[in-house]
Curated annotation (Swiss-Prot):
Cofactor: FAD; FMN
GN (gene name): glpA
Record keywords, A-Z: Cell inner membrane, Cell membrane, FAD, Flavoprotein, Membrane, Oxidoreductase
Lineage, top ranks: Bacteria, Pseudomonadati, Pseudomonadota, Gammaproteobacteria, Pasteurellales
Membrane topology according to the record: Peripheral membrane protein
One Pfam family linked to the record: Fer2_BFD
Subcellular location: Cell inner membrane
Full protein name: Anaerobic glycerol-3-phosphate dehydrogenase subunit A
Gene3D superfamilies in alphabetical order: BFD-like [2Fe-2S]-binding domain, FAD/NAD(P)-binding domain
PANTHER family noted in UniProt: ANAEROBIC GLYCEROL-3-PHOSPHATE DEHYDROGENASE SUBUNIT A (PTHR11985:SF35), GLYCEROL-3-PHOSPHATE DEHYDROGENASE (PTHR11985)
Family: Belongs to the FAD-dependent glycerol-3-phosphate dehydrogenase family.
Gene Ontology MF term list: flavin adenine dinucleotide binding; FMN binding; glycerol-3-phosphate dehydrogenase (quinone) activity
Segments forming a coiled coil: none
Length: 563
């Protein structure tokens, strides 16, 4: 099914394109590969069927893992995480909140596990320090006061949308080309070699072709379907995880449960909110685009979450969302009894006799840069390139200086606008605050998003519609869930020539529907009262119900359940 073109910005030349590498997938891994290729001087084109970070990348905790969670059962993953943790704190510091983290032991948990946990962290190179429970309560006032043990680890939070956008920005500034809402429909083969892809451009309702000697499948869980275009089998087992977004930051530190990984045992503060999760349940592969958070999952998240921080039970919930992990079965065990949570790099020339095709999957958000490095190393080998990887050393756009240094450059601006812009965009914040008076006018009070930030997102971050804008700026992600800012943002989309007046109205309708789909699973108390007020305002006062509703195809283009 096609997506409605009426909510997208038009693009230019639609002729076939040739390049060195085609990358399928616009999540963190795909964006990381595009950046790595571009920095090594390799021409590349990235194709994404929707917007960036709409898959697993945008549907997780946003946890900057120290690796401690994996230390007991998966030392290799733990070592990868702590190494990448240290790298991301340097190259992506404007995306990172260095909160640190606590692993707490409750009376029903075993202190013996804490001992094993500390030993495993030490073996993995993770700085984990046991502290007195009383000190833990001082460091994190929201923590369960009944805790009997606590360990401090170098956890933090990271914004996956910001991280992906920064990688995309660096890639395109170094020569890469990116096409969002461009869905790969088939692989073009010539004998035993993949030479390109057939894609459908949802913005312009037409088919396109892209050619390259090498195609990289970075589609995550959707990579199984992409491989099937070449009659290849990569057996994946989707694991769904549900999460809740709370109305404010309950906790200062990441709070983990010091036990074997289970449901709802991580509470992560990030931006203006915190996220509790996750659950874990296998789902059929044909349901990966139709995930809904169930009442049972909401109950589990509350019941287990309040054991980490009792105040969570009385905190307003803003929305619920769900993601899907790509668990990959080994080739000799298609039943899935031994699925991998590690990085899986497949050279299909060696594995299947099909040249020109690579798959990178598995892993996690924390290891996206390492996954990109592995994939790009293989790309270089196949293209006879010798350039080395520099992504671990070169800062991403926005991280070339500290937030404190950038704040000094815009010190004359109101503090709310200044700190929010610098927090989200780092050293690039000066670009969105220096043009004209309009740029300082407030669009979203909850997240302190200005018209200048909207302009910057449109000019430099490839925004096609309001939902894209949300991922780049947090418009509509605050307490009111777009109630007061969506109409203002829609007007700016027209003013900045992203959309016609009619398209802006259609985008507004789609955007409010997308917000409701995440609110519906937790629609009680303050959330339902706010939703009713929003409905009254947009339907009764602004007449949004008179806008022709988008069909199911269009809703796929504005996918919900992301925080």
């Amino acid at each position: 099914m096609g997506l409605s073109p009426s909510i997208y910005k038009d693009v230019g030349d639609l002729s076939s394109l040739s390049t060195d590498v085609i990358i399928i997938g616009g999540g963190a891994t795909g964006a990381g590969i595009a950046r790595d290729c571009a920095l090594r001087g390799i021409d590349c084109i990235l194709l994404e069927r929707r917007d960036i970070a709409t898959g697993a990348t945008g549907r997780n905790h946003g946890l900057l893992h120290s690796g401690a969670r994996y230390a007991v059962n998966d030392q290799e993953s733990a070592e990868e995480c702590i190494k990448e943790n240290r790298i991301l704190r340097k190259i992506a510091r404007h995306c990172v909140d260095e909160t640190e983290g606590l692993f707490i032991t409750l009376p029903e948990d075993s202190l013996d596990y804490q001992k094993t946990f500390l030993e495993s962290c030490a073996k993995s190179g993770i700085d984990a320090q046991a502290i007195d429970p009383e000190l833990a309560k001082i460091m994190e006032p929201s923590v369960n006061p009944d805790l009997v043990g606590a360990v401090v680890v170098p956890d933090g939070s990271i914004d996956p949308f910001r991280l992906t956008a920064s990688n995309m920005m660096d890639a395109t500034e170094n020569g890469a080309k990116m096409f969002t809402y461009c869905e790969v429909k088939n692989l073009i083969r010539e004998g035993g070699k993949v030479i390109g892809v057939n894609a459908y451009d949802h913005k312009n309702r037409r088919e396109r072709q892209f050619f390259a000697p090498l195609v990289v499948n970075a589609g995550g869980i959707w990579g199984q379907g992409i491989a099937e275009y070449a009659d290849l089998k990569i057996k994946m087992f989707p694991a769904k995880g549900a999460l809740l977004v709370m109305g404010h930051r309950i906790n200062k530190l990441v709070i983990n449960r010091c036990r074997k990984p289970a449901d709802a045992d991580i509470l992560v503060p990030g931006d203006t909110i915190c996220v509790i999760g996750t659950t874990s349940s296998r789902i059929p592969y044909d349901q990966i685009d139709n995930m809904e958070v169930t009442p049972e999952e909401v109950d589990i998240l509350f019941r287990e979450g309040e054991k980490l921080a009792p105040s969570l039970r009385h905190t307003r919930v803003l929305r619920a969302y769900a993601g899907v992990r790509p668990l990959v079965a080994s080739d000799d065990d298609p039943s899935g009894r031994n699925v991998s949570r590690g990085i899986v790099l497949l050279d299909h020339a060696e594995r299947d006799g099909l040249d020109g095709f690579i798959t990178i999957t598995g892993g996690k958000l924390m290891t996206y840069r390492l996954m990109a490095e592995w994939a790009t190393d293989l790309v270089c080998k196949k293209l006879n390139k010798t350039a080395r990887c520099v992504t671990a050393e070169q800062p991403l756009p926005g991280s070339t200086e500290s937030r404190q240094e950038t704040n000094q450059k815009v010190i004359s601006l109101p503090s709310t606008i200044r700190y929010s812009a610098v927090y989200r965009h780092g050293s690039r914040a000066t670009r969105l605050l220096e043009k004209e008076r309009l740029d300082r006018s407030m669009v979203c009070e909850c997240e302190a998003v200005t018209a200048g930030e909207v302009r910057y997102a449109v000019d430099e971050l490839d925004v096609n519609n309001l939902v894209d804008l949300r991922r780049r700026s947090r418009v509509g992600m605050g307490t009111c869930q777009a109630e007061l800012c969506a109409c203002r943002a829609a007007g700016l989309m027209n003013r900045f020539e992203v959309a016609t007046p009619r398209q802006s109205t259609t985008q507004l309708s789609a955007f409010m529907e997308e917000r409701w789909r995440g609110i519906e699973p937790i629609a009680w108390g303050e959330a339902i009262r706010e939703a009713e007020f929003t409905s009254w305002m947009y339907a009764s006062v602004l007449g949004l119900n008179d806008v022709k509703p988008l069909d199911e195809q269009a809703q796929q283009g504005t996918d919900s359940n992301e925080f």
